[in-house]
Amino acid sequence: MKIKNVVVIGSGTMGSGIAAHLCNANVPVTLLDLKTEISEKARERIHKSRPPLLIDKSKINNIKVGNISDNFDVVKDADWIVEAVVERIDIKHQIYEKIFKERKDGAIVSSNTSSIPIKVLSEHLTDKEKKDFCITHF
């Protein structure tokens, strides 16, 4: 499957860095956080970063922003959904529940966790959902 559209949930240091990396590869990204303002600030940080995170400043146009309450429906069109939220398993499980209700069949779902084992992350997923789930730590 060719990845044409990515949603990154969590716009902190890791989430915004992942979004920038995808932009450099010309992959459209939607960056979601609790509030749109948080995602907008992350987009600004990417644009103004020193050293630059973007190969070409115009690539910033590949990043759309939103929030998980009003804009979560973008998950339906994503080929890859990256979870990059705080390292709290309860929050991650809540996000996965929402993702797996919305995502299209076959869309990849990954966590950017650095410390939580995949067995713990996926303990509430069905066998079918587990086939599309992985850890992608950047």
Regions found by a protein language model. Give the residues of each.
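Redox-cofactor binding/interface segments in oxidoreductases and associated redox assembly factors
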Residues: 82-83, 111
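Conserved N-terminal Rossmann-fold NAD(P) cofactor-binding segment
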Residues: 28-78, 88-90, 94, 127
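Alpha-helix C-terminal capping/helix-to-coil transition sites in glycosyltransferase folds
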Residues: 76-77, 81, 105
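Short glycine-/small-residue-rich Rossmann-like dinucleotide-binding loops
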Residues: 85-86, 114
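Rossmann-fold NAD(P)-binding glycine/threonine-rich loop
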Residues: 93-138
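NAD(P)+-binding Rossmann beta1-loop-alpha1 motif at the extreme N-terminus of oxidoreductases
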Residues: 1-48, 102
